[in-house]
Amino acid sequence: LTFWSGLAFGKSSDIMGIKRNPMGIKPYSSVDENLFLRGAAAEVGWKKLNFLLFGSKKMIDANLQEDSTSSDGDITVSSFQSSGTHSTIGDLENKDALEETVFGGEVSIKDRKYTIGLITALSLYNGNINRTLSPYSQFQFNSNFNWVTGAHYNWTHRNFNFFGEISRSNNNGIAQLHGLMASLHPKVSVSAFYRNYGKDYQNLFTNAVGEGSKSINEKGILTGLDFKLTK
């Protein structure tokens, strides 16, 4: 919810797919040209504590404003590009138009039955973001700076697994999720998942379970029952 840059599937019939397990530092193997990170990362464990730091700087595609003039020399962009296609003159002009700097870290305590942690990520852009916002998109990210912080937990007790996360963006938008998975019988498993993603939550690196591709403006409860006829 607070930070995710890898592949993740949305809501599906798989009741165990409601939980995203953190993968730590992994090489990016997708073909997306904008959502990956390029930089350095380090992870250190000491007893029950785990520390992770990362930093990234790269160019991303963005739509340049044709009439943009800035006294300080900064560019002005009207939107971010994510298609990765550069088949027209306009696409080529928008390629690598904006510099993105991202850095952050996580500290967590891991025990045999539980994990709790704090995570933060700071995103900076070297241009002026000036999106044309409509009433339905008035809460979208429209700045060159965003600071997201979050806390997460995971607790296992016998056949029950409780997990959740709460996150806050720089504009005070809040998003949270909480879930339960339980094995009641070798053939019967149940799950429950509550999500409340605020309409003003702003995070370009979120990929939580939900109806939409962005973890914003959603509230609901998802329940599941898995019954195996044969084993």
Identify what each model region corresponds to.
Residues 1-231:
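Outer-membrane beta-barrel channel domains
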